A protein has these predicted regions:
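Phosphate-group recognition and catalysis centered on beta-loop-alpha active-site segments
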Residues: 2-294
Length: 294
């Protein structure tokens, strides 16, 4: 009996070590150090109550004025243009039931954001705003399996960009593509606790479990893990970003107290809905930038 017990323990130990090996990150310490110097306004420094919609040129300008980087979302249109918007269907943002991937840029240009005069920007219009100023976290939004085209078009555009940026996605295929084709681009795996009720509907439980346990890292070797703040204390995150010293990013931070907890743990912070208190190495936000915050 003792032999069986020891065999089980040894087997579990081996599985645990294999899991640790699988979830490791690339550890680009020097490159990630730059990104840790900034905080990142989620979809820009937006505040619709003050006429500043999310993922708009105006929201990005306010973020830069405040000394913040920004996280933004990129979709590929029907005519292969890269536009900055979070939702694929535009009911919430523009009040019309159309899908970005089924529209041309000309068709999208006729729409306005959240009742304002702001329109959906192209990624190529946003990049010059940040170049030489603050970094960008660019999330690629895969729809209907278009990850390859989305990656190709994005990297083609970024190939001439001289600002600081990294790419993240919920879809591991994006990171796998980057690892194979653009290994020098910093890449991050977006994730959350998919085993919770309501998370990632439509995906089999085993697939959701594998994503929660960060198993795709074995194939993608991300530079950082961007995990939902509320889920950051689950075992896979603490092992990957604590024991293995992987870089963590926390989304979406909505209170100063959450920001302080995340930064104390060494996490990048993606915030929304408030203006963070300044820290010693970051200049105070100007009066203009405060107009874009809650």
């Amino acid at each position: 009996m003792m032999g069986i017990f020891l065999g089980i323990v040894a087997g579990l130990a081996v599985l645990f070590l294999l899991w640790l090996a699988a979830m490791g990150t690339r550890r680009g310490e020097r490159q990630m150090a730059l990104f840790r110097q900034y905080r990142y306004a989620h979809r820009g420094l937006h505040n619709i109550e003050r006429g500043v919609p999310e993922n708009s040129i105006l929201a990005f300008r306010y973020a830069i004025t405040g000394g913040f980087g920004a996280e933004l979302d990129v979709h590929l249109t029907k005519d292969k243009r890269l536009v900055v918007a979070h939702d694929s269907f535009l009911d919430r943002l523009c009040g019309v039931h159309v899908r970005i991937e089924e529209q041309t840029l000309e068709e999208l240009r006729k729409l306005t954001l959240q009742g304002t005069k702001e329109t959906i920007p192209l990624l190529e219009e946003v990049l010059p705003l940040f170049c030489g100023k603050t970094p960008l976290i660019i999330e690629l939004k895969v729809e209907n399996g278009n990850y390859k085209e989305l990656c190709e078009q994005t990297c083609k555009l970024l190939g001439t960009y001289r600002g600081d940026f990294c790419i993240e996605s919920f879809d591991p295929r994006v990171l796998r593509w980057l690892k194979k084709n653009e290994p020098f681009i910093l890449r991050g795996q977006l994730a959350e606790n998919y085993t919770k009720s309501g998370a990632a509907p439509g995906f089999p439980f085993l697939a959701r479990l594998a994503m929660t346990m960060l198993l795709p890292n074995f194939l993608t070797r991300p530079d950082f893990i961007a995990f939902r703040y509320e889920d950051r204390n689950i075992l896979p995150v603490r092992l990957c970003c604590g024991l293995l010293k992987g870089q963590e990013a926390s989304w979406t931070i909505r209170h100063q107290s959450e920001l302080e907890v995340a930064e104390q743990a060494g996490s990048l912070v993606i915030f929304e809905g408030f203006l963070p208190k300044k820290r010693a190495e970051q200049p105070a936000a100007s009066e203009q930038s405060q107009q874009g915050a809650a």
